């Protein structure tokens, strides 16, 4: 199953990292905060302005992005947790 975001929404897959303390203890997922980085896997057509014109999104599929801890809505598609959020919830694109 695929999901196609509407308007100025994007679908983001969180980038997971193994969480360890400095002494090497692995922190379980239930105790760790969710990462605030992800990769965009789908984008909507753009934001509709007051004049009725559609402004394309600045982000594109494959971009690595930073977002706030409470950004977006979590959905589960084909057993995978994804985030649906508006482009304005994205704080920046990681380049390089």
From Swiss-Prot:
Record's keyword terms, sorted: Chaperone, Cytoplasm
Key word Membrane present: no
UniProt cross-references to PROSITE patterns, sorted A to Z: CHAPERONINS_CPN10 (PS00681)
Highest taxon above the source species: Bacteria
Single GO MF descriptor: protein-folding chaperone binding
Single GO cellular component term: cytoplasm
GO annotation (BP), single: chaperone cofactor-dependent protein refolding
Subcellular location: Cytoplasm
InterPro entries given in the database record: Chaperonin_GroES, Chaperonin_GroES_sf, Chaprnonin_Cpn10_CS, GroES-like_sf
CDD domains documented for this protein: cpn10
This protein's record includes keyword tRNA-binding: no
Family that this chain belongs to: Belongs to the GroES chaperonin family.
UniProt function note: Together with the chaperonin GroEL, plays an essential role in assisting protein folding. The GroEL-GroES system forms a nano-cage that allows encapsulation of the non-native substrate proteins and provides a physical environment optimized to promote and accelerate protein folding. GroES binds to the apical surface of the GroEL ring, thereby capping the opening of the GroEL channel.
Complex and partners: Heptamer of 7 subunits arranged in a ring. Interacts with the chaperonin GroEL.
Protein name in UniProt: Co-chaperonin GroES
Source species of the chain: Nitrosospira multiformis (strain ATCC 25196 / NCIMB 11849 / C 71)
């Amino acid at each position: 199953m695929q999901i196609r975001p509407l308007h100025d929404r994007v679908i983001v897959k969180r980038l997971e990292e193994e969480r360890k303390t400095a002494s090497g203890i692995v922190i379980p997922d239930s105790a760790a905060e969710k990462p605030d980085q992800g990769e965009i896997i789908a984008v909507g057509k753009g934001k509709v302005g007051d004049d009725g014109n559609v402004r394309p999104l600045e982000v594109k599929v494959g971009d690595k992005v930073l977002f706030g801890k409470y950004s977006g809505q979590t959905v589960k598609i084909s057993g995978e947790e994804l985030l649906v959020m508006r482009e304005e919830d994205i704080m920046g694109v990681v380049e390089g």
